[in-house]
Amino acid sequence: MGTPELKIILEFSAGAELLFGNIKRRELVLDGNQKWTIANLLKWMHANILTERPELFLQGDTVRPGILVLINDTDWELLGELDYELQPNDNVLFISTLHGG
């Protein structure tokens, strides 16, 4: 048997995609041997796919205020935020509410 995999979908909307190479949807296959929380995922995203101005997406170890996070269409605040443990086929959507004027 091969290494266990954790497949999830990341989506970016309302300008958040501009920080990730202008790609609105990514299907990820993560190492299923480790526990993946949103906190781990954010660190992975910063190291691997965040291409532009990380200060507009991250503040410390979390997303900055103004970035909404939905996990399977549910506000992450209802699911434990950074401590939420990712499950197979989870859909994680990041929506930017930060807009210049």
Curated annotation (Swiss-Prot):
Cellular localization per UniProt: Cytoplasm
Main location: cytoplasm
Cross-link (Glycyl lysine isopeptide (Gly-Lys) (interchain with K-? in acceptor proteins)): G101
Listed InterPro entries: Beta-grasp_dom_sf, Mopterin_synth/thiamin_S_b, Urm1
GO cellular-component term (any): cytosol
Keyword annotations: Cytoplasm, Isopeptide bond, tRNA processing, Ubl conjugation pathway
TM regions (residue ranges): none
Post-translational modification (record): C-terminal thiocarboxylation occurs in 2 steps, it is first acyl-adenylated (-COAMP) via the hesA/moeB/thiF part of the MOCS3 homolog, then thiocarboxylated (-COSH) via the rhodanese domain of the MOCS3 homolog.
Pathway membership: tRNA modification; 5-methoxycarbonylmethyl-2-thiouridine-tRNA biosynthesis
Residue numbers of 1-thioglycine PTMs: G101
Cytoplasm as UniProt keyword: yes
Superkingdom field: Eukaryota
Gene Ontology annotations of biological process type: negative regulation of JNK cascade; protein urmylation; tRNA thio-modification; tRNA wobble uridine modification
PANTHER family (alphabetical): RURM1 PROTEIN
Subunit and partners: Interacts with cer.
Function, as annotated: Acts as a sulfur carrier required for 2-thiolation of mcm(5)S(2)U at tRNA wobble positions of cytosolic tRNA(Lys), tRNA(Glu) and tRNA(Gln). Serves as sulfur donor in tRNA 2-thiolation reaction by being thiocarboxylated (-COSH) at its C-terminus by MOCS3. The sulfur is then transferred to tRNA to form 2-thiolation of mcm(5)S(2)U. Also acts as a ubiquitin-like protein (UBL) that is covalently conjugated via an isopeptide bond to lysine residues of target proteins such as Prx2/Jafrac1, Ciao1, Eip71CD and GILT1.
Family the UniProt entry places it in: Belongs to the URM1 family.
UniProt-recorded name of the protein: Ubiquitin-related modifier 1 homolog
